[in-house]
Amino acid sequence: MTQLASSYDPSSFESRLYAQWESAGHFKPSGSGEPYTVLLPPPNVTGTLHMGHAFQQTLMDALVRYHRMRGYDTLWQVGTDHAGIATEMVVSRNLALEGKGETRDTLGREGFIAKVWEWKAQSGDTIERQMRRLGTSSDWSRSTFTMDPQPSAAVTEAFVRWYEQGLIYRGQRLVNWDPVLKTAISDLEVENVEEDGFLWSIRYPLADGVTYEHVEHDADGVETLRETRDYLVVATTRPETMLGDTAVMVHPDDARYATLHAAQIVLPLTGRLVPVITDDYVDRAFGTGVVKVTPAHDFNDYQVGVRHDLPLINLFTVTAAINDNAPERYRGLDRYDARKLVLSELEDLGLLVETKPHKLQVPRGDRTGQVIEPYLTDQWFVKMDALAKRGLELVESGQVKFVPPNWINTYRHWMENIQDWCISRQLWWGHRIPAWFDEAGKCYVGHDEAQVRATHGLGAEVALHQDSDVLETWFSSQLWPFSTLGWPDAQAMDERGFARYLPSSVLVTGFDIIFFWVARMIMATDSFTGQVPFRDVYITGLIRDAQGQKMSKSKGNVLDPLDIIDGISIEDLVAKRTSGLMQPRMAEKIEKATRKEFPDGIIAHGADALRFTIAALATHGRDIKFDLGRAEGYKNFCNKLWNATRFALMNTEGAQFSGVPQPQTETERWILARLDAVAAEAQAHYANYRFDLLAQTLYEFAWNAFCDWFVELAKPALNGAVQDAADSTRHTLLYVLEALLRLLHPLTPFVTEELWQQVAPRLGITGDTISLQAFPQRGDVDTSGYAGAEADIEWLKAMVSALRRVRSELNVPPSKQVRLWLQAGSSDDRARVARFASQLAFLLKLEAIDWLAAGQEAPPAAAAIVGELTLLVPLEGLVDMDAERTRLDKEIKRVENEIGKCNGKLGNATFVQNAPAAVVEQERARLNDWTTQLTGLREQRAKL
């Protein structure tokens, strides 16, 4: 075996270790033990690894590695989504860059799809390569692409079944329409952006000479205007859509318009008559209390139109130009050119009352940036009512559990307000809808054209053409939990372990897709298999930058996880952040901010430091602020672990141990007891998905208990003359280190594997990899008699800390020996001083330890207090008196602050009444200890 390198350099071993794991098949299911399955939310095949992926995949990998070490039969199902819209855009852009004049339209459907498959073969595995760099222990041999033959067959089967059950239908409804992509898109693909716009107030003339008494009042209720009007005033932010108005509505209880409920309006610019209707939807307090109704171009108006059976007039073409349903002079105009003409004509007619600035929430497509139109079109839909009712029952009955549980409320709200789901998209890349039409427009649904013809007795003379639309990607994604396990093919289901691995154990995902994906998987899995897709849904927060801002290309604040792992120069980072911007004018601002934040670029941290950072940040909150400084700190943590291992190896050279150590010293018993407790805490944190508490527990044990204290406290025994104690301490040093590496492995797999390969042989442990070793359990070591050791070592630590603080504040050189006088103290203190005298002398460079006799005057000395014991370091020849006075004043102030904190808690009636009695009593004991210390410090100060 090669010798451990002298310094921690993750780039020297991370890729090598991953290749070894994968080639050895360590990530494949074992086939034995209780199954533990995790579903990877399939990233877009077009995508690259971003911080959101890295965040969730780190937590998933930790869960998988942890359960693999506990003997579970682990399956981490991975794969990629075909990402219809995104993929078409990427391939279209690449065609343009090639400069051959080829476009989507010139190639035609078959030619374009062939180009997509070519691109997928060349670039489609980018994100999976990046996932390997992060350390994800997925079974890559089972990686699934949503357009593979088997999942494609599952999509067809699901569509046909739901159609035959009457759950899928074709109809005309309002959808989100992207006029650039010329397709419907989902709500998740729409970003509502606050922008400056205008609110126009327009006169709508009443028909048939109808008038009403219009009255206005000021804020105090005083009448300011009374006049007879033959028009209503309507406010709108989209005047061009008035050409498609089919009603004007008022609130039924609005007295101002009570006489107009049966009236009609002459719609300006068109001359059409539209009714005045009443509806509770109207907010009487907003504007004039009169609202135009355009059912074909507003989602709320559409619902009003359905309730009142209003006509739906679609004004737009697929590119958002005005169509033939508008007066002839508007036809063919872009929607915004039509707006200008409408406003101009209204002004000429004296119907434009007012124009004022107004803040708008503008819906824009997340890929094109174009304003999205509510658009009336023929689409395929899934009836959701019955599916949603059952999906809600499965969660509320506890068959699917949300963590944290408050997300059930969000789930319930969505499920109780669900609308039918538009599943068709006007694209070429994707699962084509298995529906065929004859020349009369009659629709036939089946698995393929041959089956359709056979089922319906259609001969070759009957011309059929398949629906040109494809299914939106969420349709195939909802089948992910069971389509990846071979459904609906019985042989594939058997081969891929359908009965064994469904339901999966946990889904780790973000709250933003609870409805779009989580809910749909619950409904679909129940509908098609009669099971739930997963037992737990762990909802993570969303990764934001250190200031809490959303990471986005347009803001220039995106952090690439691979740049954190491998490092990147400032020039490359600037180039990455400023290229391909939708708003190129932002490049200069982004470059300036980037150079300010990362003047020297980003150093390489390694995958383990990034992973541990992610775990430490994984609270149960809604947002996660990612601070690169934390990654630097955890790189130092990995380095500390590396150096502690080198210390252990140097001090056990040639040694060979086996089994559980039989401790000879209190120090060993203390660290073994701490190890036992930490193993139990770690398992509890995994069970509760508290990765933040897990990271904190392991960090404190590794850095503080093991690296700082045990290694230090073990040195006297390691260097002492008592051979049994030295050998036992060496055994314990290796034993605890090896267990610590196993505790840390799910979070930091690379460094722990590299170190374990060096440590394990000295303990007689066989095996190729730490990843298949048992995770530490409470009870691995019988620590039932170690309580006294824990108390003793906590006392010893307090003594060492107090004396080191004194030495530091007095600037006593580390090599200089000092004398220690002890005063007061309990019988336990005296016994412990006698028992640990050699360790105290070794660790603190003490030339002597003496007790002051009762009534003996203490020399001028620097003082520290540990419980009832006063520690005195004589100052003669050590420091000047002024410096010691300053030190004591600082220490007195520190203790006074602690007393203030205790008094604040104990003076808080809520704390005293509601906190557990043991906690309150502990606070009182702390107050007593601090008060005793303060008394002693003041006495020492008085002597100076």
UniProtKB/Swiss-Prot annotation:
User: Which SUPFAM superfamilies does the protein's record reference?
Assistant: Anticodon-binding domain of a subclass of class I aminoacyl-tRNA synthetases, Nucleotidylyl transferase, tRNA-binding arm, ValRS/IleRS/LeuRS editing domain
What reaction(s) does this enzyme catalyze? Answer: tRNA(Val) + L-valine + ATP = L-valyl-tRNA(Val) + AMP + diphosphate
Q: Where, subcellularly, is it found? A: Cytoplasm
Enzyme Commission no: 6.1.1.9
UniProt keywords (A-Z) are: Aminoacyl-tRNA synthetase, ATP-binding, Coiled coil, Cytoplasm, Ligase, Nucleotide-binding, Protein biosynthesis
Residues binding ATP, per UniProt:
553
Give GO BP annotations, semicolon-separated: valyl-tRNA aminoacylation
Q: What class of enzyme is it?
A: ligase
* Residue ranges annotated as motif 'KMSKS' region: 550-554
- Coiled-coil ranges per UniProt: 878-944
The UniProt entry, under Pfam families, shows:
Anticodon_1, tRNA-synt_1, Val_tRNA-synt_C
Disulfides per UniProt: none
Instruction: Write down the Gene3D superfamilies for this protein, in alphabetical order.
Output: HUPs, Isoleucyl-tRNA Synthetase, Domain 1, Valyl-tRNA synthetase, C-terminal domain, Valyl/Leucyl/Isoleucyl-tRNA synthetase, editing domain
Q: Which HAMAP family match?
A: Val_tRNA_synth_type1 (MF_02004)
Q: What is recorded about the protein's domains? A: ValRS has two distinct active sites: one for aminoacylation and one for editing. The misactivated threonine is translocated from the active site to the editing site. The C-terminal coiled-coil domain is crucial for aminoacylation activity.
The protein's name: Valine--tRNA ligase
User: What broad taxonomic lineage does this protein's source fall under?
Assistant: Bacteria, Pseudomonadati, Pseudomonadota, Gammaproteobacteria, Lysobacterales
